[in-house]
Amino acid sequence: MYLTQNKLKFGIQNGLNVARAGYTEDQILTACILADKTGYDSIFYMDHTNVPQWKNATVLDPWVMLSAIAAVTQNVELGTCVTDAIRRHPSNIALAAISLDRVSKGRAILGIGAGEAQNLKEFCIPFEKPVSKWEEQIQVIHKLYDSTPDNIVSYDGKYYKLEGACLQAPPIRKPRPPTYMAAGGKRTLAMTGKLGDGWLPIGYTPVLFADHKAQIEKSMNENNRTQEEKDNFQFALDIDVYFSDDAEQSWAKMKEAVKVSLFKPEILRVHKLKEIEGFDFVKYFTEYSMSDQSWIVKMREAATQMPDDVARSSIALGTPEDIIPVFEEFMKAGVNHFVIRFWGKNYFGSIDKFATHVMPKLRETAKKQNN
């Protein structure tokens, strides 16, 4: 069953792929212009302070870069993938999203997650109660979207408070810039169904995506979301694509990184894999940082024990003919908005090749399945 009530969407992600390659700002903008002209629906930008595993990477502010991208594009939606909620006050995030929405003439998306230690530890920002803070953040942000001097808003949360607050720049997009939540656990998936307009995870197999999608839909029903909200909800996925003439050779290059990205308790659960002894997932996500890279070594050692067939189902490698079936499996699992990280030396060529040889066939597949 294909979930494509809405138009099937494709976007590009300027994330670790771009940071690691060291592309200049001009090169990134050129890639985004190409995506806008070749039929992509969205462009996303990662939000990190650093990437500890690659010391020579270039890491830029997403809101500044997305505003620059807005100035040179006309059609694509523009979003963060994803903003780190715990690092900023919700008023800053709300105003940044509104500002992007206005300069882009109504094309902004707020991709937001709870955060991770690597963006916080050396900056002495406490990584405490991130999920509870994230939930309050989204509630505050949504209130501030509707605020004006004549419609001041208040909020009395445990971590955030507003007392007659307002912003003075209403968003263009109605009812608001959509909120895509980066959820991956039982509690955050329920929050996504309650508060989100979309879901944007990373490191998923089709099996895990379908499982978590069902949890979100259950929460949407429990929270009495309207039919319109359900119909417009974006089940997005940050997915890796590596074009090459030899899929096996590409898999050999990407194998370790893919397993590290995929390695999480929920993957072990849905694929009925044994727990990896001696690895503490909670400590990894709360302690891994630039100053303590021992955790990435531990992660690599543990992740290599994951079966190849499970890991490989999460990534699209090889020729267009190799890649299309991978996307079709995710479409069956419920993805209706693909956010693609292109890997390899030819970023521009990959953007064009996907638009020319993959995108039309997937759109046709979705159209046939829904007729």
Locations of regions flagged by a protein language model:
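Short, acidic/polar
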Residues: 23-35, 96, 183-191, 319-329
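Glycine-rich, proline-tolerant flexible connector loops at the mouths of alpha/beta enzymes
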Residues: 42-65, 69, 84, 121, ...
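Conserved, mostly hydrophobic/aromatic
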Residues: 39, 47, 69, 100, ...
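Active-site mouth loops of central-metabolism enzymes
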Residues: 13-26, 83-90, 173-184, 241-244, ...
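N-terminal beta1-alpha1-beta2 module of alpha/beta enzyme domains
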Residues: 1-72, 76-77, 177
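An alpha-helical appendage that flanks or caps ligand/catalytic pockets
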Residues: 2-4, 131-170, 209-332, 363-371
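Alpha-helix-loop-beta-strand connector modules within alpha/beta enzyme cores
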Residues: 56-79, 137-140, 144, 355-369
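Hydrophobic faces of well-ordered beta-strands that scaffold small-molecule active sites
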Residues: 10-14, 43-45, 78-80, 108-112, ...
